[in-house]
UniProtKB/Swiss-Prot annotation:
Domain of life: Bacteria
MF (Gene Ontology): aminopeptidase activity; dipeptidyl-peptidase activity; serine-type peptidase activity
One GO location term (cellular component): cytoplasm
NCBIfam families: PRK05371.1-4
Subunit structure: Homodimer.
Family as reported in the entry's similarity comment: Belongs to the peptidase S15 family.
Protein name (record): Xaa-Pro dipeptidyl-peptidase
Pfam families documented for this protein: Peptidase_S15 (PF02129), PepX_C (PF08530), PepX_N (PF09168)
EC number: 3.4.14.11
Organism: Streptococcus mutans serotype c (strain ATCC 700610 / UA159)
Reaction(s) catalysed (UniProt annotation): Hydrolyzes Xaa-Pro-|- bonds to release unblocked, N-terminal dipeptides from substrates including Ala-Pro-|-p-nitroanilide and (sequentially) Tyr-Pro-|-Phe-Pro-|-Gly-Pro-|-Ile
InterPro entries in alphabetical order: AB_hydrolase_fold, Galactose-bd-like_sf, Pept_S15_Xpro, PepX_N_dom, PepX_N_dom_sf, Xaa-Pro-like_dom, Xaa-Pro_dipept_C, Xaa-Pro_dipeptidyl-ppase/CocE
A biological process term (GO) from this entry: proteolysis
Alphabetical UniProt keywords: Aminopeptidase, Cytoplasm, Hydrolase, Protease, Serine protease
């Protein structure tokens, strides 16, 4: 294990002593270090009244247990302190470590022994993670060290799990949104699931905007998957024009209906464990699925500002600007008198996407977004550079398929009877607007692009994204992060996994960092927490995270791709075409081994380089036809240790998110030998070779010069590594599977790869 600690907030000795005493630790700067150590260890093991037994179970060094040491006149040394400290943090001598100081060095242990300020070491220990994924103070509180009395308690600038999760209020209200997306003449009502502790304190809110949470129509969506086999469309030369999107909300009339408590309750909802963590620390949880979902009104508009407005309306209700009702009858109002109105949003993928969209409305009470694997432009999710491009792992999906999946109103049979005909009519119109024929950008996609609205963001922004996420690709976060206003606070965690959460990883204290941030922004705690702008996981070594100031570099290194002209044949024999169409994994396997129709260039790396940003291909090429599709991937090629894409379980149920509440597994990305690693990739319609809004003719056998930006990356290359640049046409996982008979010729002597380096 290596420590990468970002959540700890440095403090003075006097403040540390004050906070320790407030927690009940009976230590004092007037006592000796050994006396304080005995007291501290006794209280850490508060469940066991036999302290002599506790002391005998811990060693001070390889020859002495703690009981013997405490009764001796030996001095408390650095080695003894570290040996004891590691045991308090759940590391086992002779199994996890032999010599404490060696382990401390290799694990980047964040505590320096300070015999003159020893109380500070106890304070730091409580704020440091154990081997099993919780800080020591969180572990103690989870075991009952502090009562769950529904009052806020803080340590090191973070809220502690002192809220009773065994007696939670679970209620449902229906918020009136300024929308009529199903065109039935009534404002849409939005179902809101609320989970909150029973307390007199005014609670902030952690909200997850999830179109999935009221259920999904998986069978219906599967039936709508598109066939990917077909011919690449030859488009007419043109310039595409779009207009700025300006969503216009409807008027919501004021109401003087009777006020009532919420009347509808629920017993269970599929919660997000990061939300559970905050729930136990005095943050109400809200789950809302928005328009077009089960028990709400409206049509599933899939990514536009009408959908976002349905989530914004919930924040408006929390702050008294719109009405919530007890039911669809709209006869009694419910007031959000239990909240301070301040909101943070959480969630991954579609959920994180809605966080970004919400932030671009500039709503002032949205103080923090924690957006993980989030989309910033829906065009770039379902299209790329003038091509229909399925999300990685989901061939044949498009936004109409997502609409069918998330329009969960049809899961309620009565709603289906009353509203399915109107839904089918509106879905058919959406299908026309998405334009699968050309793959071009249009007004539909402009209305689902949050980048032009990034300047309106006022919230404190936290993004996480996997650099191996080929579902929501890295450009999504690269573009939005670099479009954020200079004056706001922003951070990004870039990990080496794919489309995954990272709050329960061993190597980084993400969960605790978010606690410090939300305690400051939503609870008003003046903790002076500072988080680096960019925190990224170094791909070249295990459990190592580093800091950067920028995602993307203007400094580049350029390399020639060769000296000859090479051919990419688009056409495959029918047996190969069928094999690859039936199993895109077989295609990827052959592609990386130079067995597909491709040009593969191996480029030796002569010095260490940190790739930071978008690798660019400058190519001179021609097509034998009046069309052409170009795909590219850049690999770190050759057998060596690399991260796997998915985290694996290190310890089951070792993380307690409260006091015996919402336990989850500790995870980490495995680091093991592999033959290659994808650094970046991209696809391009050669008719869109200049830019997205310009469609140009391709003249057969006429040379073209193109610049092709691939997906953004942060990747450490080392001297002796080898880059493999793969150029090909059809990508059987993501693009149209066109088996027509044409070739691309690339003049490698006039082609280069341009690598941005930090």
């Amino acid at each position: 294990m290596k420590y990468n600690q970002y959540s700890y907030i440095g403090t003075s000795v006097s403040q540390a002593e004050k906070e320790l005493k407030e927690l009940g630790f009976q230590i004092s700067s007037q006592k000796t270090n050994k006396a304080n150590l005995a007291t501290f260890v006794s209280q850490v093991y508060f469940h066991n009244p036999d302290k002599d037994d506790v002391f005998k179970s811990i060693i001070a060094d390889s020859q002495t247990d703690l009981a013997t040491f405490l009764h001796s006149d030996r001095e408390l040394t650095e080695e003894i302190f570290y040996t004891i400290a590691l045991q308090l943090l759940e590391f086992t001598p002779y199994i996890d470590f032999d010599e404490a100081k060696t382990f401390i060095k290799h694990s980047h242990f964040p505590i320096i022994f300070q015999p003159k300020h020893f109380l500070l070491n106890f304070y730091q220990l409580l704020g440091t993670r154990t081997k099993n994924g919780m800080t020591l103070i969180d572990k103690l509180v989870s075991q009952g060290f502090l009562p769950a009395d529904n009052h806020y308690r803080y340590f090191n600038g973070k809220s502690l799990a002192t809220f009773d999760t065994n007696a939670l209020i679970r209620e449902i209200v229906y918020v009136e949104a300024p929308l009529d997306t199903d065109k039935d003449g009534q404002l849409d009502l939005i179902k809101v699931n609320i989970i909150r502790p029973q307390t007199k304190a005014k609670l902030p809110v952690v909200m997850t905007a999830s179109p999935y949470h009221q259920g999904t129509n998986d069978k219906g969506a599967d039936k709508k998957l598109h066939q990917m086999e077909g011919e690449l469309t030859v488009k007419k030369a043109a310039t595409i024009t779009v207009t700025d999107s300006h969503f216009q909300a409807l008027q919501v009339p004021s109401s003087n209906l009777p006020i009532s408590p919420a009347q509808e309750s629920f017993s269970y909802i599929d919660s997000y464990t990061l939300n559970d963590y905050f729930l136990a620390r005095g943050f109400a949880n809200i789950y809302v699925s928005g328009v077009g979902t089960k028990d709400s009104d409206g049509f599933m508009t899939s990514g536009d500002y009408a959908q976002i407005e349905s989530f914004k309306a919930v924040i408006d209700w929390l702050n008294g600007r719109t009405t919530a009702y007890t039911s669809h009858k709209r006869d009694k109002r419910v007031m959000a008198d239990w909240t301070n109105g301040l909101v943070a949003t959480t969630g991954k993928s579609y959920l994180g996407t809605m966080s970004t969209g919400l932030a671009t409305t500039g709503i002032k009470e949205l103080k923090v977004i924690i957006a993980e694997s989030a989309i910033s432009s829906w065009y770039d999710y379902y299209r790329e550079n003038g091509l229909v491009c399925s999300p990685g792992g989901y061939p044949g999906e498009d936004i109409d398929v997502l609409t069918e999946l998330t329009y969960s109103r049809n899961l309620a049979a009565g709603d289906y009877l009353r509203n399915n005909a109107q839904y089918q009519k509106m879905l058919a119109e959406q299908v026309k607007q998405i334009d699968r024929t050309s793959g071009d950008y249009n007004q539909f996609w402009q209305d689902r692009n949050y980048l032009p609205h990034a300047h309106k963001i006022k919230a404190h922004v936290v993004y996480t994204h996997g650099l191996q996420d080929w579902n929501v690709k890295p450009n999504q976060v690269y573009y939005i992060f670099n479009a954020l206003p200079e004056e706001i606070q922003k951070h990004i965690f870039l990990h080496q996994g794919q489309h995954v959460y990272m709050h329960n990883w061993q190597s980084i204290d993400f969960r605790e960092s978010m606690n410090a941030l939300l305690s400051e922004e939503l609870l008003g705690l003046q903790n002076h927490f500072q988080l680096p702008t960019i925190i990224w996981q170094d791909n070249s070594q295990v459990q190592t995270w580093k800091k950067l100031n920028n995602f993307g570099s203007h400094q580049t290194r350029q390399f020639s791709l060769g000296q000859e002209k090479k051919i990419i044949d688009n056409h495959y024999p029918s047996s190969d075409f069928k094999l690859y169409s039936d199993d895109y994994h077989a295609f990827k396997h052959d592609l990386f081994l130079k067995k597909a129709n491709e040009i593969a260039i191996d480029l030796p790396i002569q010095e260490d380089m940190l790739v930071n940003g978008q690798i660019k291909l400058n190519l001179t090429l021609k097509s034998s036809s009046n069309k052409g599709l170009l795909s590219a991937q850049v690999l770190d090629y050759g057998q060596k240790k690399r991260f796997s894409d998915l985290p694996t379980i290190l310890e089951h149920n070792s993380i307690d998110n409260g006091q015996n509440f919402s336990r989850e597994a500790l995870r980490e990305l495995p680091f093991k030998k592999a033959p290659y690693r994808i650094i970046t990739k991209g696809v391009l319609n050669l008719q869109n070779r200049t830019d997205l809004l310009t469609i140009e003719d391709i003249f057969p056998n006429k040379w073209m010069t193109i610049t092709f930006n691939l997906q953004a990356s942060l990747y450490q290359l080392q001297k002796g590594d080898s880059l493999r640049i793969v150029l090909y046409t059809t990508d059987f996982e993501q693009t149209v599977r066109d088996n027509s008979n044409y070739i691309l010729v690339v003049d490698l002597a006039k082609s280069t790869i341009e690598i941005p380096i930090a």
